[in-house]
């Protein structure tokens, strides 16, 4: 019946200024809100509070903070994670950051193999390199090329429940899993 947006920007309090608007189109109902006065390049945690009971993260978020699993991600893989406000909320929270710079592609100089000549290696990053880090994976590309591999199919890299899974239990399709490194390293 009602949904509030709660987060760092309103001290995780129910506030009528953060009551989401409800719009219906044919048989489709959408909830939306405009949040003002956010600082550019600052990360804010937030959740949706549904009917005053259920706290959920935005399923379309590009980053989540997971109070149960992020503590097991080594700092060498994901340095300086945003702190989870245990005293304010529970469950997974979404992260929003306005004013982010667009990703600047570093390599545009590559050739894709003909689809009839593909030799694909399906890979779970976590199991392929010991430290489960994308940078280490990049260092092993010569090894794969020497085997004749010309394409890599990564097993799911988006967030999923826990850190030790093949990723077939996805939960946030647009949020790369922090267990493999920061999004700037992808």
Q: Which sequence ranges carry the predicted segments?
A:
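Basic K/R-rich, polyanion-interacting modules in nucleoproteins and related proteins
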Residues: 1-6, 56-117
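Short, solvent-exposed loop/turn and secondary-structure capping segments
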Residues: 56-61, 131-136, 156, 163-167
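Short, flexible loop/turn elements at secondary-structure junctions
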Residues: 9, 24, 37-39, 124-129, ...
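Aromatic-rich carbohydrate-binding modules that target alpha-glucans
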Residues: 1-43, 51-74
């Amino acid at each position: 019946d009602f949904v509030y947006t709660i987060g760092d920007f309103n001290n995780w309090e129910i506030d009528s200024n953060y009551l989401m608007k409800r719009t219906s189109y044919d048989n489709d109902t959408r909830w939306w809100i405009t949040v003002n006065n956010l600082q550019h390049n600052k990360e804010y945690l937030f959740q949706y509070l549904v009917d005053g009971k259920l706290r959920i993260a935005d399923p379309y978020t590009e980053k989540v903070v997971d109070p149960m699993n992020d503590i097991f991600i080594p700092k060498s893989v994901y340095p300086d994670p945003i702190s989870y406000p245990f005293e304010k909320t529970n469950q997974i929270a979404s992260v929003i950051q306005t004013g982010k710079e667009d990703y600047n592609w570093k390599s545009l100089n590559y050739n894709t193999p003909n689809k009839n000549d593909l030799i694909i290696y399906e890979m779970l990053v976590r199991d392929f390199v010991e430290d489960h880090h994308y940078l280490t994976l990049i260092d092993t590309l010569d090894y794969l090329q020497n085997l004749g591999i010309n394409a890599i199919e990564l097993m799911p890299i988006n967030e999923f429940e826990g850190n030790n899974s093949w990723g077939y239990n996805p939960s946030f399709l647009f949020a790369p899993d922090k267990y493999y490194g920061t999004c700037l390293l992808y």
